[in-house]
Amino acid sequence: MKKLSLLLLVCLSLLGLFACTSKKTADKKLTVVATNSIIADITKNIAGNKVVLHSIVPVGRDPHEYEPLPEDVKKTSQADVIFYNGINLENGGNAWFTKLVKNAHKKTDKDYFAVSDSVKTIYLENAKEKGKEDPHAWLDLKNGIIYAKNIMKRLSEKDPKNKSYYQKNFQAYSAKLEKLHKVAKEKISRIPTEKKMIVTSEGCFKYFSKAYDIPSAYIWEINTEEEGTPNQIKALVKKLRKSRVSALFVESSVDDRPMKTVSKDTGIPIAAKIFTDSVAKKGQAGDSYYAMMKWNIDKIANGLSQ
């Protein structure tokens, strides 16, 4: 009788252990790594509280050239899914992402995915070859919707039990971005034609320019090149002296000294800081993808209408 009772107790204990283990497995959240704060924010809007999310490049830092920390390698090696921009961002310059996923023993299209998949690529000036793509596709809100859709698709594949949750969030989020896209087109269209030009430090507004029908100019073309050389500044100053542009802009993640020199030499004021490669710090204006795009649209429209 004692043996029978002991056996029953062991069986019940094992059953309880199995039930707890099964519950932990069922409750286990996906671990997701995003290469920068913009992709992380879009992911958060789709994934909600269903994932554990880590963003590699800190807010305010340049994602073109970054040196991953040991913690980044650890998080990446443990991740169920990794989202990166692609099109010459993390794999351009010092190719930091290529090295990271190699060290983390991750495989493309199995562990890590480009959220820019199916975006119509724009190239750097006078270039059409691989490695010369302009990576700033997210500055067109329509491309932001493509990013969100790709993230939703991959999360649904990795975590099918929450597929309907991800789809529902995508529908709401994409509608929000679509509405802002229409607002952008309307606001930018009201800028006087002779003043219609976005002038920034890096030439990162090609996608924005095409989407919202506004030309752009810059000091240097991409952050992996020389930045703010005397010849670059001289060329932009010469161009601006022939224009009626009323405002300059400087990105939040770059050194503002070259643009201050341009402003001094042309007499054109710097209207505002705008966001390109990173969202703002939490609690500040522009601390999400939606908020940074709204900020940019408002500052550009207001600055160039003066």
Curated annotation (Swiss-Prot):
Belongs to the bacterial solute-binding protein 9 family. Lipoprotein receptor antigen (Lrai) subfamily. The keyword Transport applies. The lineage of its organism: Bacteria, Bacillati, Bacillota, Bacilli, Lactobacillales. CDD domains: PsaA (cd01137). InterPro entries: AdhesinB, Bact_metal-bind_prot9, Lipoprotein_PsaA-like, ZnuA-like. Part of the ATP-binding cassette (ABC) transport system SloABC involved in metal import. Binds a metal with high affinity and specificity and delivers it to the membrane permease for translocation into the cytoplasm. May act as an adhesin which is involved on adherence to extracellular matrix. It is an important factor in pathogenesis and infection. May contribute to the formation and accumulation of dental plaque. It comes from Streptococcus mutans serotype c (strain ATCC 700610 / UA159). Residues 1-19 form the signal peptide. Keywords: Cell membrane, Lipoprotein, Manganese, Membrane, Metal-binding, Palmitate, Signal, Transport. Coiled coil: none annotated. This is Metal ABC transporter substrate-binding lipoprotein SloC. It is found in: Cell membrane. Transmembrane segments: none annotated.
